[in-house]
Amino acid sequence: FQAEDGIRDLVRSRGLGDVYKRQIVNSFNSTKILKFVIRYLSIINHRTLITLLLSLIVPFCAYNFEIIYNIDLTLISIAIIFPLVFAIRGAFKRREKALEFLSLHRGAIKTISYFFMNSSKLPDDAKNEIKEILNDLSDSFLNHLSQSNCNTDKIDKKTELIYKFIEKHNEELSGGVKQKIFRFIRDVHVSQENLIAIHTHRTPISLKAYCLIFIYMFPVIYTPTIINKIGLENPVGLTYFVIILSEFILISLYNIQDQMEYPFDKDGLDDIKLDYFKNAYKKV
């Protein structure tokens, strides 16, 4: 809304006609709507296409070959729903933990910076140096989380620079200040190690594979039972609708879980906005 008000102020200040004003504002609104739609369609991918094809092919074969039976679907429902719900809950907890440790990481780095800035014996050049070290560590670590690389050697070396800086300016920092700084360096290490663990280790692959296989198998088992319940005398389109809708719901939940499981890659709707956790310090 603030951006829209800015557009309106801009066209008003430049003396454009009412028609041009409306065109610019409408174009801006259309762009917002388009981006909104694209974001919410991000859960549709190749797996959605596979399930759609299965939902069309299986009923076609069932009707043509008259494959109809009536079985209890409780077991197959448990086989899909239980691992799917378990995986979604696990992905949600991972995301919440990631937010918790990102906040801890940012807070610890900012607090460390405050201790250095309040050290009266520390020269301005040294204060600027430690600011650059902390900025570089924050940016590098968050960039590392957004990538698939699991090697943390560079991050470890950048974190170690804080300790080397303390050693270098040992006489200019009081013992009490150093103890407090080390306390928050520990928080930096704890948050980094936990975030690296979240970044590296995912939901058990075997569980996800098991869940996906049964989602693909679901139309094969489910379709003849639906035909039996609906009846051959009822419209064929009703069977297709039920199968397609059921498969779309299941695969969409699976895709949401898959996106939520990678909270740092900026690919899903619920991905964490890492830029909000960066530290930007001005030089003294």
Could you describe each region identified by the protein language model?
Residues 83-133:
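Juxtamembrane/interface alpha-helical elements of multi-pass membrane proteins
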Residues 209-229, 237-253:
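Bilayer-spanning, highly hydrophobic alpha-helical transmembrane segments
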